Amino acid sequence: MEIQTKTLGTQTVEAHQIITLERGLYGFEKYHRFALFDAVQVPFIHMQSLDDPALSFIAIDPFLFRPDYELDIDDVLLQPLDISSPTDVLVFALVTIPPDGSAVTANLQGPLIVNKKNRKAMQVAMGGDRWRTKHDIVAEMAERRAQEQC
């Protein structure tokens, strides 16, 4: 299937790359279908709305820069995804790339949870103060590398 994107032009995606968010994302509730594919810069993922070619997001696997990341989500909240095993789950954090060149951040407080078997997804808001909506990806990756070298 070919889709139009605002920044990357025409892209070809397969059915397994499409996710459905029944409730949409926070602030974007009317957009339900997105295609996931590699972004220009690795390790980022491009998340393109299939409902509006002008709407897209960048996401990242949070475990790449925060291996200690833990999801504190009530199983009842995840029931609409029909998850039968933890191995069926993909987790993404939405990324903010400010136009002024300031820190690229990831939202670890509102992860995107995807059932990779049925491609159902939802964004979940986690309470508590351990995870924030703006984690500096570059700084945290550098900190992780420094810890690994010790």
From Swiss-Prot:
Entry annotated with the keyword Cytoplasm: yes
Coiled-coil segments: none
GO biological process: bacterial-type flagellum assembly; regulation of translation
Statement: the UniProt record of this protein carries the keyword Chaperone: yes
Gene3D superfamilies: BH3618-like
Gene Ontology cellular-component terms listed: cytoplasm
Alphabetized InterPro entries for the sequence: Flagellar_assembly_factor_FliW, Flagellar_assmbl_FliW_dom_sf
Keywords (A to Z) from UniProt: Bacterial flagellum biogenesis, Chaperone, Cytoplasm, Translation regulation
Cell compartment(s), UniProt: Cytoplasm
Assembly notes: Interacts with translational regulator CsrA. Interacts with flagellins FlaB1, FlaB2 and FlaB3.
Protein family (similarity comment): Belongs to the FliW family.
Function: Acts as an anti-CsrA protein, binds CsrA and prevents it from repressing translation of its target genes, one of which is flagellin. Binds to flagellin and participates in the assembly of the flagellum. Binds to the C-terminal region of flagellin, which is implicated in polymerization, and participates in the assembly of the flagellum.
UniProt name for this protein: Flagellar assembly factor FliW
Species of origin: Treponema pallidum (strain Nichols)
